[in-house]
Amino acid sequence: MGEREIVFGRVRFVFRSSDITRENVDAIVNAANSHLKHGGGVAGAIVRAGGYEIQAESDEYVAKHGPVPPGGVAVTGAGKLPAKFVIHTVGPIGDSPSSDEVLRNCLLNIFETAKQLSIKSIALPLVGTGIFGYPLERFVNVVKEFIKEYFTNYVGPLETVIFCDIDPSKIKKLREALEQIIQS
């Protein structure tokens, strides 16, 4: 599938219709539930491709730290995936009024964790827009505003952010919205 990219500040944003488990990046993001039980959606695909050790590390994390709150993150190894890390985030569920703030917190925690881990490349799914039912239009608007705020004066190791989804129409909507930042 075709891919497009834009550069904003010092970071390259790539938009790709692809399987996140095949991305050759330092870290991939998993849209998880708070107990890090990776059964369906992106989470299930990550464990199927990366191996049970990802689930075992997730179970260990929850046993030690408790459930991950909405907007929070947990980091595990990536098992057999090409990535080094999986950053699990608990994204918005459904269309509740607090969902936008949950997504903003996810993004902030993902990118701050990436900075702490000296990650240069990261791949993200469209968190919450699949089995969790968060509306794509709201996702696009929150991500657009977040990127504008966070990456305008960004200084850190991150060079490449890949947004990927198996649905090319979802990726196209996100890319078109983010291209507006460059043009404004």
Please give the residue ranges for each predicted region:
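Phosphate/ribose-phosphate-bearing ligand recognition and processing surfaces
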Residues: 93-184
